[in-house]
Structure formats: C-alpha cells, structure tokens
From Swiss-Prot:
InterPro entries: Ribosomal_bL36, Ribosomal_bL36_sp, Ribosomal_L36_bact. The lineage of its organism: Bacteria, Pseudomonadati, Pseudomonadota, Alphaproteobacteria, Rickettsiales. SUPFAM superfamilies: Ribosomal protein L36. GO terms for biological process: translation. Keywords: Ribonucleoprotein, Ribosomal protein. One of its GO terms (molecular function) is structural constituent of ribosome. Belongs to the bacterial ribosomal protein bL36 family. This is Large ribosomal subunit protein bL36. One of its GO terms (cellular component) is ribosome.
Amino acid sequence: MKVVSSLKSLKKRDKDCQIVKRRGKIFVINKKNKRFKAKQG
C-alpha cells in the first residue's frame, strides 16, 4: 500500500479504483486489481 499526500493521481491509475473513507482516513481501493491500494496521510 502506498501512502501519499494526494490521492487524485492514484485514483486515475485504473478505471476500477474507488475512494473510500474508513476510520477517518481516506483510501483508494481496487477490488479487481488488488495492487492498486493507497492511503492518504
């Protein structure tokens, strides 16, 4: 999982990426290709 300050560019890496908010943190997840994961912070 990558940790970045801005998730906008990482959301565009794949068309199935989606942004979710869990426990007060923002994540990019991808259910079809699990390697596209990122966390903001």
